[in-house]
């Protein structure tokens, strides 16, 4: 069972109060995951050359602008196939300074909200990072394909939206592509502020980072376990 399968199971556990009465639905959802679609989405994201936060925003073929517009279009296509069940929009903020910010820039997150049937203001967030970079975090011109870090996580989020949007859940699900992660977690900070301003009751967050990597630093290959990366972040003290 792949990591994406585990992620979808976790979503069901958090988002459905009567999970154990719906075993058949859970397994149907798992069976719908398509590795071919995920690979296709990763390939598409890589094709933009670089998705660096400071890269081209005008071109339709290269840079962070082209990548985020493609992701938004994919969410809109998914929504059109579920009777407009997703609210798709950009959430943006203007960043003027930072150790990895060479010039002021807009940070765009791509958001798609699937409303819950019982608790529409209770949210589970599933995110993937849009941006990529090479070893030099200030180099926004050279190619940085970022297939694993983090086209894999973004593709996983899109695939989850494709599948879960076909079903109804008690709580709302937010699928989001975050920008500015490599430059200082700017997209995540912006979404947190937006969530507070909007009065969201966030009950769970799953950020998919490098889900395409199944080989550890010790050479052990394992696609049945989670590797947890986290750091303390005191939300209330910063945004309350």
Predicted regions and their residues:
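Solvent-exposed loop/turn segments at secondary-structure junctions
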Residues: 50-53, 94-98, 117-119, 130-134, ...
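Metal-dependent peptidase/peptidase-like ectodomains
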Residues: 178-240
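Structural recognition of the beta-strand scaffold that forms the well-ordered cores
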Residues: 29, 37-47, 54, 87-90, ...
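Alpha-helical metal-binding/catalytic segments enriched in His/Glu/Asp
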Residues: 112, 126, 130-132, 136-184
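Extracytoplasmic/secreted proteins, especially bacterial periplasmic and envelope-associated proteins
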Residues: 25-29, 33, 37-40, 44, ...
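Bacterial Sec-dependent N-terminal signal peptides
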Residues: 1-23
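Second-shell loop/turn segments in exported
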Residues: 24-33, 51-63, 97-101, 139-150, ...
């Amino acid at each position: 069972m792949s990591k994406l399968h585990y992620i979808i199971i976790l979503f069901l556990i958090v988002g459905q109060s009567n999970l154990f009465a719906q075993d058949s639905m859970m397994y149907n959802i798992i069976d719908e995951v398509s590795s071919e679609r995920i690979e296709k989405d990763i390939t598409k994201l890589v094709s933009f050359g670089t998705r660096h936060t400071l890269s081209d925003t005008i071109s339709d073929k290269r840079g962070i602008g082209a990548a985020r517009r493609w992701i938004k279009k994919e969410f809109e296509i998914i929504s059109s196939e579920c009777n407009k069940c997703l609210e798709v929009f950009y959430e943006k903020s203007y960043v003027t300074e930072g150790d990895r910010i060479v010039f002021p820039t807009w940070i765009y997150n791509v958001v798609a909200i699937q409303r819950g049937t019982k608790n529409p203001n209770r949210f589970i967030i599933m995110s993937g990072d849009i941006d990529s970079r090479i070893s030099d975090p200030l180099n926004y011109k050279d190619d940085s394909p970022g297939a694993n870090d983090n086209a894999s996580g973004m593709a996983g989020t899109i695939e989850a939206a494709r599948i879960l949007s076909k079903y109804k859940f008690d709580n709302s699900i937010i699928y989001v592509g975050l920008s500015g992660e490599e430059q200082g977690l700017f997209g995540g900070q912006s979404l947190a502020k937006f969530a507070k301003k909007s009065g969201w009751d966030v009950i769970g967050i799953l950020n998919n980072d490098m889900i395409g990597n199944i080989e550890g630093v010790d050479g052990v290959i394992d696609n049945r376990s989670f590797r947890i990366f986290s750091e303390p972040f005191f939300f209330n003290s910063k945004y309350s």
